[in-house]
């Protein structure tokens, strides 16, 4: 079995979307996608992750966008840092922090 893990420094998830990350995702749909520098508040991440979930549905990886497991940590300072993780694989538990 092959497991595809992708990591990407997005330098802002909204900027990445404008630059075509959705097209990249449609071609690749990794099993696990780790994102750094998401630079967005929670409500934006939730919306983007739903959009990305729709791509996983289109690619036959999951049945509904809600089946995409997501974990994220938003920076308390607006427009800074932030990380996110998407996977269509089951997540047993998560921990935020070191």
Model-derived features: positions:
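Extreme N-terminal starter segment of soluble prokaryotic enzymes
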Residues: 1-6
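Active-site beta-strand/loop signature of hydrolases that rely on acidic residues for catalysis
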Residues: 8-9, 25-43
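Non-transmembrane, interaction-prone segments in cytosolic or luminal domains
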Residues: 9, 13-16, 50
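Short, acidic/polar
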Residues: 14-27
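Short glycine-/acidic-enriched loop or helix-start segments at secondary-structure transitions
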Residues: 17, 43-45
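Structured beta-strand-rich core segments of catalytic domains in phosphoester-bond hydrolases
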Residues: 39, 46-98
